From Swiss-Prot:
Record's protein name: Imidazoleglycerol-phosphate dehydratase
Alphabetical list of SUPFAM superfamilies matching this protein: Ribosomal protein S5 domain 2-like
PROSITE patterns: IGP_DEHYDRATASE_1 (PS00954), IGP_DEHYDRATASE_2 (PS00955)
CDD domains the UniProt entry points to: IGPD (cd07914)
Cited NCBIfam families: PRK00951.2-4
Organism: Leptospira biflexa serovar Patoc (strain Patoc 1 / ATCC 23582 / Paris)
UniProt EC number: 4.2.1.19
Alphabetically ordered keywords of this record: Amino-acid biosynthesis, Cytoplasm, Histidine biosynthesis, Lyase
Major subcellular site: cytoplasm
Length: 197
């Protein structure tokens, strides 16, 4: 497993540079011009103990869609690459997180297959220039490019900010569990197939 990676993604719509360390301490720095997105990403970093340094410029004069989507693509690809053959990791992680009146569960499987499912209230409205529906776009593209199963269930809750924050915090916690090294099986691939994509 690689400890640190720096990758870029540049299109006619976005220019992104990400420094990522899955074995970090939760240190982060963001320069995206999308404050709410930075706030959500900080929860993945902090609660996942993932170091992230992200610089993003996108066509936010139109909207934030391309910026959020392309960040998820790059982050997912880097997670998949950095995990390598996945030897020794727990592979699975799940966390149920309370945040005031909200209760959210996130479960992940880093087994090399994509699946995404969200169950909960509609994510709509805006947070500054960030469209709330982009959270689902981010999660789907992250799961697709990290080649992981990602299930998100918001059991109940009302405050839109709390709902979003609980999702990203629980995602960080679940990823932290899944990428952690199982000291009882640190030289084993966590699959009866003997390999993971």
């Amino acid at each position: 497993m690689l400890r640190n990676m720096v990758e870029s993604r540049k299109t006619s719509e976005t220019d992104i540079r990400l420094d990522l360390n899955l074995r970090g301490s939760g240190v982060y720095a963001f320069d995206t011009e999308i404050p709410f997105f930075e706030h959500m990403l900080s929860h993945i970093a902090k609660h996942g103990l993932i170091d992230m340094d992200l610089k993003l410029r996108g066509d936010i004069g139109i909207d934030c869609h391309h910026s959020v989507e392309d960040t998820a693509i790059l982050l997912g690809q880097m997670i998949h690459t950095q995990l390598g053959d996945k030897k020794g990791i727990f592979r699975y992680g799940n966390f149920t997180l309370p945040m005031d009146e909200v209760l959210t569960t996130v479960a992940v499987d880093l087994g090399g297959r994509f699946y995404f499912k969200y169950t909960g209230p509609a994510l709509d409205g805006k947070f500054g220039i960030y469209d709330a529906e982009l959270t689902l776009e981010f999660l789907q593209k992250l799961a697709l490019n990290a080649k992981m199963n990602l299930h998100v269930v918001v059991h109940y809750g009302e405050n839109r900010h709390h709902i979003h924050e609980s999702i990203f915090k629980a995602l960080g916690k679940a990823l932290r569990q899944a990428i952690a090294i199982d000291t009882s099986a640190k030289d084993q691939i966590p699959s009866t197939k003997g390999m993971l994509e």
